[in-house]
């Protein structure tokens, strides 16, 4: 399903080369004034074509709000935003149905929908469907910001080139400010050149490259979340895995914690004035599924774009035999920079739901 | 919330030292004959006290089925299983409320529930609450087995000691048979000695150690799952993070995929007779959220048991000051071996829901 | 919330005088060819302005499908249909916020949304929002028709003028054919004149009139539904009460059953060839929440349109005092004829969900 | 499904003659002190055997709370209550599977569950399963009472004998007090004799009789509920139809509103001091799905108990032929008096969810 959420539900629709894509957001609090420019900014961070890491295919992702807003203020009714597709169905992808692209959902989508799914540009599986998520997330971010909750992500790695990580106990507001407007979001900006070189090399080789995104939520009060199946980790992961290419997620020390001893992993509590804090933050701001008041921190792993120019082996489903495939057209050699605002947005929708569950939004 | 699922819902209840714990399973197909001995076997794999990696505290986890079964056959009505607690509230944990244990949910639970939550033995946050998950999962496993779907997990690592991984394109049935009855489940059994030594050393040092569990689902037909928010990754992760101590999850190549090039990560399709398969399985049996017919493979990271004997710094919430804490009582120095059947069980509940969504169960 | 459903979810959006209204339908089976003319026909049955019972305000309810359809065949991805509003915000309703209209949601909406809801034309509370329900229901009807399930409703009464009721054990296919294309759907067409006279008299008196709609679902196989909270009555009622003006619903003999003896109300079973049927159908095709194979029959009570031309007492929320109100503009003196396809549509969405739950769709 | 609710979920389990029945309540606020005697009182109002209107079969419905309570105060964890069945499976109902009882779920349950459902005493379809609903509702009532919300119902009619109705604009607290402890709840107690005579006559004739229950919710603040599918009517009806024998529900003037003119049905607003009220209450406290601050009022129609002593025609599913059936054993000739606390309880669970949705609980 392409719907998600309880208290605040999003319902994403659209196919890459159909008439339009968009999202309905149901359950928004009324009376929140939205900064539309701020939303467009986030959408433009996700939009393709800004540099060589991204596909040069142009999208004008100007969302039209059909409902739920009056004078840019939420009415409490479902907010529907539509983005028209200007780049509609063409012959570019004509051979996909017969020869599924390795790493793509062509084959699984074909089986799941009995061959009736729209395959142009990936259809409903396309990364383009993350644009509505960014819209919804940008709305939620603005609502959360009113409660002092901020969300920022950065490119933690591309291939083997790493950015430094967030200091998990101290994420300065200025850093968040900077990351939130960046199209190549890095903590240590000196990593950019190396990362771009890595991507450029892949592009030249008709190849692509994966990476990781690290995301932090600051200002989340202690006591948000629930044990077991409505824990923060479960809620965030269930929406983040809705983003194409995400194949892993970890919170706090994550997979590193699996190598640690309890005495290393445990974060000791202390009083910082009247506030209980921890000196380290291996728990990623979450204990027993519930926020501790420390920053919530997670990292998502994104596989390399499966669309590559190199010839690949596949099958021909029509002829029932093995086949060779060359994918033409222009594709992002690395989608990690553009995934940054998408992951922030997914986190925002998740946190809005979590806040609502405990009557804090 | 402690409820999970759509087509097949589980509702877990209980507190560690309360009268009883259990689960209601709603939405089970009628007419499935359950092998109760098989269920007890899985529950005993999770039960503590079998060896030095586990707490010697004895639990008699014999579930009593109150409803939903007639002659061991599902009636279609909700199945409720209750496990009585013989080890009920005691004074052992008297200081927790004042001094939250680092790494535990004591502090966050206290804030979330305004101090009203049952803290004895961890209350509803206790690892003991995984027993009902194993019950529910064991029921689902048997139902799935009738469709040729099998689930097996093993200890992929404890600290820095690793088992070998599943061969992701070929998981022999005999291996699954063996793992499914093992209390220290390993593919390469020669790793056991080293792992036990690692755990024993931690125990001697009043410390604990984390690890990872790898889980495979075989026999899942292609075409199960959905794009976006009902993808297999999202569904499995949302229940697996309901297991205490899980801090990360990855599917297929997972975080390694983030370092790969598209030409490495893409799994090429080929015809194996009439069946479309992939030669490698970096996609972990999932493309676009939907099963490809290859084994579904994921790994979960478990942090070390936070209950350790060493003295730790914490706060005294009553006195409003920093404090020292020594945890007495007996605790697992490593919960990874016991987590194996829990993760298999969570996967089984998830897969049962996924199968139902596409009318295959 | 304006979302409904489990296996097949609808998410309705829009405000009466906003840019557009519409619906996202998520979970549709792929590969169903839709007859768009058939959908437009149902929408035109609901559209206003066809005669004196309806408001002369013109709406061009031509839905534009943005996604989920390829060559008029469902792709399995969410189907979004948008209806543009040509009649957008005007000054017609300027005094509503200060003086809530009796019988309308002006007052309650104002409290619920802190005064931020769009009040023009009733905003999200407007009867116009039933157009997307008719769209969604028309899609579902076509899918159900492929399984031999048909849905038909008629005006059971307007004020004190009654149509005859369905013969609950025998609803001829020809009657359904006729009702399904009628804009003033009656079993006994001789009632039309009297009903129209009743409505016309109300219109002349600047008043309005209520009525009831009776709806039948035929061809639903026995064994659909569930005990307790997913019973057919509960599922249908939870969506039917989403239609403005509905204040009551009854299944089978309904409120009459409350006056009956068991020996009268019980429907005896008999074999009609190989099929188990009942000789009477006081149970309305539902026993224990589950279909018996007999027609499912329910009646909904609709209150009179609250917008009337007569002067009424109300309050002035701004001046904090009692006030007089005269509603100008054109309003349906009776919405019952137009409610017929809306109720059929809500039933269709409900039945599609019920069928999916038992793997029959 | 036998689960219901969003913010506060109940999961009911059990079969009439199985080991036990009960309910898990998930999502309760922590820190609410429950008056257990008050809960038992409500359960005893529902319990059978108190007089000739009820079955003399004895049930000891003493619920055992397994979790979620500490010192009778909610911990925030799921609360599970179990009622042991002392009257377990017997031969009394041996012929049901072959010959389904008219008016019962025997036939539909048999089809739905392929003959695997437990038929003893009606299994999961039994009216006995309303005991857990009363438990859950009694918990919710106490929580609502802390917010000034009270719920009371009465026998509005048995057969053709009527009680007077609530004055919908003024429901005195003393009346609620009296109704809430009554086992034959009437506003006008002089109706009791006639009602009992009606029931006794049915009993003597080996017959049964239906009736209606009217329920009022007072103290619900204005602004609770939502337009469309989370309106108060839809939410209440979806749980009330989960009570066996309910075949109709109406809010406010309900089916009478269908005969009214707008000028009659519209409830005019006025200021009562600072409070906006309506002089009449045909809207039953609900406009646009949202509470107006006036009492919420609804009536439910209950069909007569289908178990009657008279010989009835049915079919023999085994022999595939028509058959005669005589039901022995003791059955309520009228379940309406016992349904009163059940309907109050269902309303309480519904209202608790509605209050939570708007952050008021």
Specify the residue positions occupied by each region the protein language model found.
Chain A
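Glycine-rich anion/phosphate-binding loop at the beta-strand->alpha-helix junction
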Residues: 13-19, 206-322
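Glycine-rich, N-terminal phosphate-binding loop and its surrounding beta-alpha-beta segment
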Residues: 42-108
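Internal helix-turn-beta structural module
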Residues: 9, 307-361
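Glycine-rich, mobile lid/loop segments that gate access to catalytic sites or pores
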Residues: 112-228
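A short glycine/serine-rich beta->alpha loop
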Residues: 9-14, 117-129, 222-226, 281-287, ...
């Amino acid at each position: 399903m392409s719907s998600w959420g309880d208290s605040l539900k999003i319902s994403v629709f659209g196919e890459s080369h159909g008439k339009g894509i968009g999202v309905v957001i149901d359950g928004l609090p009324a009376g929140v004034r939205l900064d539309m420019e701020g939303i467009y900014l986030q959408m433009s961070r996700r939009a393709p074509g800004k540099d060589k890491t991204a596909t040069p295919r142009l999208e004008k992702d100007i969302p039209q709000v059909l409902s739920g807003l009056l004078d840019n203020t939420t009415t409490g009714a479902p907010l529907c935003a539509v983005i028209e597709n200007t780049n509609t169905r063409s012959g570019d992808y004509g051979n996909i149905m017969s020869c599924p692209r390795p790493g793509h959902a062509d084959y699984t989508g074909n089986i799941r929908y009995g061959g009736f799914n729209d395959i142009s540009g990936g259809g409903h599986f396309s990364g383009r469907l993350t644009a509505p998520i960014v819209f919804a997330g940008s709305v939620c971010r603005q609502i959360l910001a009113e409660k002092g909750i901020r969300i920022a992500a950065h490119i933690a790695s591309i291939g083997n080139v790493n950015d430094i990580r967030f200091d998990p106990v101290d994420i300065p507001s200025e850093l968040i400010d900077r990351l939130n407007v960046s199209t190549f979001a890095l903590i240590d900006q000196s990593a950019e050149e190396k990362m771009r070189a890595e991507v450029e090399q892949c592009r030249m080789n008709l190849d692509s490259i994966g990476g990781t995104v690290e995301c932090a939520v600051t200002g989340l009060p202690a006591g948000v979340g629930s044990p077991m199946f409505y824990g923060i980790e479960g809620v965030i992961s269930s929406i983040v895995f809705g983003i194409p290419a995400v194949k892993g997620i970890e919170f706090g020390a994550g997979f590193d914690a699996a190598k640690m001893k309890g005495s290393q992993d445990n974060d000791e509590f202390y009083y910082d004035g009247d506030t209980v804090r921890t000196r380290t933050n291996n728990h990623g701001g979450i204990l027993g599924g519930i926020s501790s008041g420390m920053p919530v921190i997670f990292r998502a792993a994104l596989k390399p774009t499966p669309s590559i120019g190199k010839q690949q082996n596949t099958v021909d489903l029509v002829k029932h035999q093995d086949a060779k495939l060359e994918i033409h057209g222009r594709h992002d050699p690395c989608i990690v920079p553009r995934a940054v605002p998408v992951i922030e947005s997914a986190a925002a929708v998740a946190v809005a739901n979590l806040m609502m569950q405990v009557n804090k939004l």
